[in-house]
Amino acid sequence: MKYPRLEPDAIRQALSKLEGWSLREDGAAIVRSFKFSSFAEAFGFMAESALAAEKLNHHPEWSNVYSRVKVCLTTHDSQGVTERDFLLAEAMQKAAAGRGN
């Protein structure tokens, strides 16, 4: 299913409601780096985020090195940022909040 790509103004407005997220230089994704106190906290965040991603059927591009997790969200079918990216970003914010990020 193809989801409508958000207009730049809608992306800026949605980003203003999320702490630490920004628009990638090419405008095709939103990105954030999370820093936790330990690898276990980072991995717990990833596990909780993975469950949210499965529920939304929308999966992140991400990498983990020790206590840091870098995330890139885009909707490949729409070739840009959609509401689904923001739904997953919000879920990730909640997952990080309880982990001292």
Curated annotation (Swiss-Prot):
The protein's matches in Pfam families, at most eight in alphabetical order, are given as:
Pterin_4a
Q: Name one GO biological process term.
A: tetrahydrobiopterin biosynthetic process
Record keywords: Lyase
Q: Which GO terms describe its molecular function?
A: 4-alpha-hydroxytetrahydrobiopterin dehydratase activity
Which Gene3D superfamilies does this chain map to? Transcriptional coactivator/pterin dehydratase
Could you tell me which InterPro entries the record lists for this protein?
PCD_sf, Pterin_deHydtase
Question: Which EC number(s) does the record attach to this protein?
Answer: 4.2.1.96
Q: Give the catalytic activity.
A: (4aS,6R)-4a-hydroxy-L-erythro-5,6,7,8-tetrahydrobiopterin = (6R)-L-erythro-6,7-dihydrobiopterin + H2O
Q: From which domain of life does this come?
A: Bacteria
Please state which protein family the record places this protein in: Belongs to the pterin-4-alpha-carbinolamine dehydratase family.
Protein name, UniProt field = Putative pterin-4-alpha-carbinolamine dehydratase
Q: Which organism is it from?
A: Agrobacterium fabrum (strain C58 / ATCC 33970)
